[in-house]
């Protein structure tokens, strides 16, 4: 019940501002790409955060606060530091995802002769991860853009907020590049599947063509009409077999000359 209520609050509004307070709702990604909704309430320089689980972004930020408390005189400073840390984490996730895309690309190139359905599953999984990261950083961009419009937020923190926005825009470019690479890999995979299917169809087509003349010859001599001298010929059976073999060899030679095989 509490999870549903928090999700409803989080979805209803990312940012609410009154005369002296800010309520910001944002999703923080875990290492397993699950989203953790976090609610921030800041009033008179005091920051309160509401979340269900521990997050690395908070732990790292708290360490920075304890090491040098002078750099964090108010909750506004802590809030900005939290978003800075979170964006850095998002950048690390994008870098890890990019490495996975590179490995997948190498795997597809190495297995170009035999494609596996598991590769397509991996592509879809990476597409989902990139989508989640993009949604996450878009969420941060929306909240920080609203904070920049706040008239009582400390002006000294505006440059840092602006820098976060620039970093987020850079991450958008990386996610777009990731989408492009994954689309290319998906097209490559489907192309390899088509090539493999065409090879199979080609093999069956060649087999059908090769055995078509022998089948025709066998069918002709299987008619058993009265006026078929070969049926009563001593070497008729060998003649039919030889004719079948000759037709197969002839077709194979034609295919070789035409470079169809």
Residue ranges and their predicted role:
Residues 1-6, 65:
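N-terminal pre-transmembrane cytosolic regions of membrane proteins
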Residues 169-261:
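Hydrophobic alpha-helical transmembrane segments and their immediately adjacent juxtamembrane loops
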Residues 1-3, 74, 117, 213:
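General structural signal for secondary-structure boundaries
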Residues 19, 27-192:
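Extended amphipathic alpha-helical scaffolding segments in membrane-proximal extra-membrane regions
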Residues 4-34:
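Extended, Lys/Arg-enriched charged tracts that mediate electrostatic binding to polyanionic substrates
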Residues 12-14, 92, 138-139, 229:
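Proline-rich low-complexity regions
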Residues 16-17, 91, 109, 225, ...:
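Aromatic-residue hotspot detector
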